[in-house]
């Protein structure tokens, strides 16, 4: 595998325009509680964000993509193809205590008609929640850096257009968010020691990152 020439780290601040439904699979308080970390704080996993972005780029996991791919050989004479993702996405955490709420729902049958005796409730985060996450691009020898930048720009545009949504119930308008601020920093062999602090949130705050 080619050597990494540069790491580009982006710090993105976001605001949710609609409620968010991100289930943990736990039903302690409702039939579907919000995903929380070990400190009981809500978050959205980086893998979930990455999945939404890949879907927006319309790339299958077997197609060459900024986010990696894996393709099995068609015959014994051929070799498997693949590449690890050049894009890392951190979990999305919230900057302050978001507003929780509980919504009642009813199950639908195959004809999309409500089944009144099958009601359930879900825990959600209300719109207006503020959060942030990191994106990191590893640029290697022979990579098309401009194409990578284009894909990132396309992803950001997709977020702000409401086409990349997070969580469940997206068809009901949930999970819409906008990027309010982006800051980026490049790490090369000239400043690679600084990479140790790349995910230090205080560093980005001290750099004067503010919402648009």
What name fits each language-model region?
Residues 1-212:
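RNA-binding basic/glycine-rich loop and surface signature characteristic of RAMP-family CRISPR effectors
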């Amino acid at each position: 595998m080619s050597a990494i020439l540069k790491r580009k780290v982006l710090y993105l601040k976001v605001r949710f325009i609609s409620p968010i439904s991100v289930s943990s699979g736990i039903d302690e308080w409702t039939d579907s509680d919000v995903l929380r970390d070990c400190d009981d704080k809500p978050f959205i996993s980086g893998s979930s964000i990455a999945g939404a972005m890949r879907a927006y780029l319309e790339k299958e996991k077997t197609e060459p993509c900024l986010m990696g791919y894996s393709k099995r050989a068609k015959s014994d004479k051929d070799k498997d193809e693949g590449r690890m993702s050049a894009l890392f996405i951190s979990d999305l955490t919230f900057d302050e205590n978001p507003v929780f709420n509980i919504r009642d729902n009813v199950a639908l049958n195959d004809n999309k008609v409500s089944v009144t005796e099958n009601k359930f409730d879900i825990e959600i985060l209300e719109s207006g929640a503020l959060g942030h996450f990191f994106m990191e691009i590893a640029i290697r020898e022979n990579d098309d850096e401009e194409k990578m930048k284009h894909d990132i720009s396309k992803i950001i545009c997709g977020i702000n257009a409401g086409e990349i949504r997070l969580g469940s119930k997206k068809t009901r308008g949930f999970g819409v968010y906008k990027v309010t601020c982006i800051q980026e920093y490049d790490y090369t062999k000239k400043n690679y020691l600084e990479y140790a602090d790349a995910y230090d949130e205080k560093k980005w705050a001290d750099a004067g990152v503010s919402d648009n």
